[in-house]
């Protein structure tokens, strides 16, 4: 099968943890590799304003792996909001791409991509824009459109008092939910939100769990990892991985470690908090928001906390192996990439009981869930876990064992299986001509930097959870 994957506002080749790059980038990267491994031909399209490393800021094509090409569309947009205002232009650009117009299936990630896909389909039905479109119209064929929202505007507004998503997005997501052929939810919690918040037809929503790259994310030697990272063997390491955002709860991490210092100064003196991430979205070019200014002041005032740059996956696993505890204090989270990666690496998490996180972290078994974002409760949970070596070892073992059920090939198979299209058999290879189609310059993945793989995971059938304050 020929599959067109849209990740328009952010490239799957971008470094997670900064700008608009996060778990979705990893999801797209890993899922298209799984589709290709299953014998499908995949064309991925992005209009990421930051461009694709290896193309020097130009529009063009990058060969990721066999049967997977990444295309940078030529659009003049400085950020995600400008892309959202250019849906018609994006649709027309897609209709100029053979990898889009010849697709049997379109898988759109995020609402901007879904809007562009639906608009392109509308334009194709109005008039024949190419020979490919004419053939499709005459034969009655129409590519199925699948969407993964990843985040839902209404849910972000519900879960965070500082979130004010644009009305354009809220209206578009409701429209998308009723127009596409299939909606992919990462967790049962997200499925409920899609149905209740967007009015999606329950029969059109499938839960397809993201996977974990177990060849990369696995338990390892802590002492060796700390030597690599320049960390002392005798200190406790508390890790946060992600963008510096209110919705991600970065402030809770800093405040919890400061609270630990008040409650147990000796323990705090032996604890190092590492924030592995950078600012998000438009923060860097426009100047820091009041939230980031306050966060920066709090970090400067807390001697146990340091900030390090985001790192590619092959380095990130070393941080997971070196740390004692991962903190995931998200205020809204449709899935929870880092909690799943950490679990596979044998690192237990203290996480918020929101969104998809309870599907990854089983309270009292593979980690700890906290029902609110009161730093005092997080400090209490942190102190208890740091003081109990046996508890951490037990949680780590369970976390690693629990993560084995997550697999990217199963993710891809779940989505394709939900479509139930037996006549769309795998296309075994991309021809040489197809690999060089168009006037774009094609570059191999080896010629670009930061195309490392990361992954995430959750269980398929969540059980009721005991959610605690602190522990």
What are these regions (language model features)?
Residues 1-66, 467-471:
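N-terminal subdomain of nucleotide-sugar transferases
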Residues 189, 211:
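Carbohydrate-associated surface elements
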Residues 331:
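Aromatic "clamp/platform" in nucleotide-sugar-dependent glycosyltransferases that forms part
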Residues 363-364, 368-375, 384-390:
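Conserved acidic donor-binding segment of nucleotide-sugar-dependent glycosyltransferases
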């Amino acid at each position: 099968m020929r599959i067109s994957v849209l990740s328009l506002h952010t490239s799957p080749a971008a470094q997670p943890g900064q700008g608009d790059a996060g778990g979705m980038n990893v999801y797209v990267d890993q899922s298209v590799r799984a589709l290709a491994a299953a014998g499908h031909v995949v064309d991925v399209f992005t209009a990421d304003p930051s461009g694709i490393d290896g193309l020097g800021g130009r529009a063009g094509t990058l060969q990721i792996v066999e049967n997977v090409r990444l295309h940078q569309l030529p659009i003049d947009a400085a950020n995600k909001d400008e892309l959202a205002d250019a849906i018609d232009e994006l649709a027309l650009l897609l209709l100029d791409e053979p990898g889009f117009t010849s697709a049997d299936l379109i898988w759109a990630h995020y609402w901007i991509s879904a809007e562009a896909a639906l608009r392109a389909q509308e334009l194709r039905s109005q008039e024949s824009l190419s020979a490919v479109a004419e053939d499709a119209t005459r034969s009655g064929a129409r590519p199925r459109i699948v969407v993964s929202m990843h985040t839902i505007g209404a849910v972000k507004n519900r879960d965070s008092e500082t979130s004010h998503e644009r009305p354009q997005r809220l209206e578009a997501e409701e429209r998308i939910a009723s127009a596409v052929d299939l909606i992919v939810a990462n967790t049962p919690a997200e499925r409920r939100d899609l149905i209740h918040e967007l009015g999606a037809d329950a029969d059109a929503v499938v839960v397809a769990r993201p996977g974990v790259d177990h060849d990369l994310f696995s338990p390892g030697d802590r002492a060796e990892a700390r030597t690599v990272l320049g960390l002392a063997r005798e200190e406790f390491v508390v890790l946060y991985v992600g963008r510096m955002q209110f919705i991600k709860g970065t402030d809770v991490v800093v405040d919890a470690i400061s609270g630990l210092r008040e409650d147990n100064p000796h323990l705090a003196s032996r604890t190092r908090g590492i924030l592995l991430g950078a600012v998000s979205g438009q923060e860097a070019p426009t100047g820091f928001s009041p939230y980031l200014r306050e966060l920066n002041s709090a970090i400067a005032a807390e001697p146990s906390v340091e900030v390090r740059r985001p790192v590619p996956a092959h380095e990130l696993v070393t941080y997971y192996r070196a740390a004692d505890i991962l903190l995931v204090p998200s205020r809204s989270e449709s899935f929870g990439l880092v909690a799943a990666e950490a679990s596979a690496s044998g690192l237990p998490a203290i996480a918020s009981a929101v969104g998809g996180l309870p599907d990854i972290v089983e309270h009292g078994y593979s980690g700890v869930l906290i029902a609110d974002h009161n730093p005092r409760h997080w400090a209490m949970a942190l102190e208890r876990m740091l003081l109990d070596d046996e508890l951490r070892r037990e949680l780590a073992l369970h976390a690693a064992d629990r993560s084995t059920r997550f697999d990217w090939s199963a993710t891809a198979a779940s989505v394709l299986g939900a479509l139930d299209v037996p006549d769309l058999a795998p296309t075994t290879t991309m021809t040489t001509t197809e690999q060089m189609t168009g006037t774009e310059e094609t570059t191999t993945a080896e010629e670009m930097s930061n195309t490392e793989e990361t992954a995430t995971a959750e269980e398929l059938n969540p059980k009721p959870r005991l959610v605690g304050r602190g522990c």
